[in-house]
C-alpha cells in the first residue's frame, strides 16, 4: 500500500488526528497530552510507537532492566497486545502496535490508532514503574554507592513528571 493511499485514509478519520506520512513512510503527531506518536509504514503493516524511556548509561549499568520489563510486560492482555521493543543503539524502550495493511480501511485504521492511543500511556506509566523498581531493587541488594542511588532517585523523579 502506498503512502498516498495511506494519507487518503487519514483524511477520512473522524475521531483521531494523525499527521500525514512523509516520503520516508514516517508520521509524527503530537498528541493532546504532549506525547509524540510515531507511525511507520512497513511492507505488511502500519506500526505505531511511543517512547517509554531512554535508559542511557543506565542500560549498561543495569542490564537486568529490559529483562525485568519483558517479565512484567503483560503482553496480550490488559494493554491490548501492545508490545515493547528495546533499541540497543539509542537505549530507548518503545511501546509498539501494528495494524496489518491487508484490506486496510479508514475505519479499521482509525480504530487501531484509537486503541494504541488509549492504551499506550497507561502501559508506559506501568513500564516506568517497572524501570524504577528495577533500579531501586538492584541498589538495595548490591549495595551500590550512595551517589548512584541519588542518580536513580533523580531518574525516579524524572519518570514521575
PLM features per residue range, with description:
Residues 1-38:
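Charge-rich, low-complexity N-terminal segments
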Residues 12-13, 68-72, 76, 112-126:
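Conserved short hydrophobic interaction patches
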Residues 26-27, 46, 91-93:
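Hydrophobic residues embedded in beta-strands of well-ordered beta-sheets
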Residues 37-58:
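Short, well-structured hydrophobic secondary-structure segments
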Residues 53-92, 96:
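Short, internal acidic amphipathic alpha-helical interface segments
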Residues 90-114, 118, 125-136:
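Well-ordered alpha/beta subsegment
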Residues 128-161:
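Short, highly charged C-terminal tails/helix-capping segments
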Amino acid at each position: 500500500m502506498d503512502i498516498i493511499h495511506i494519507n487518503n485514509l487519514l483524511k477520512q478519520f473522524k475521531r483521531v488526528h494523525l499527521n500525514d506520512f512523509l516520503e520516508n513512510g514516517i508520521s509524527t503527531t503530537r498528541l493532546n497530552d504532549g506525547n509524540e506518536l510515531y507511525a511507520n509504514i512497513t511492507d505488511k503493516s502500519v506500526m505505531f510507537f511511543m517512547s517509554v524511556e531512554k535508559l542511557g548509561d543506565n542500560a549498561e549499568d543495569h542490564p537486568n532492566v529490559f529483562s525485568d520489563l519483558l517479565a512484567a510486560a503483560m503482553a496480550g492482555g490488559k494493554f491490548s497486545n501492545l508490545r515493547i521493543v528495546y533499541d540497543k543503539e539509542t537505549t530507548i524502550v518503545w511501546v509498539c502496535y501494528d495494524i496489518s495493511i491487508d484490506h486496510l480501511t479508514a475505519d479499521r485504521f482509525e480504530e487501531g490508532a484509537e486503541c494504541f492511543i488509549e492504551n499506550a500511556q497507561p502501559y508506559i506509566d506501568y513500564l516506568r514503574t517497572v524501570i524504577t523498581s528495577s533500579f531501586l531493587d538492584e541498589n538495595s541488594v548490591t549495595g551500590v554507592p550512595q551517589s548512584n542511588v541519588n542518580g536513580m532517585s533523580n531518574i525516579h523523579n524524572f519518570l514521575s513528571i
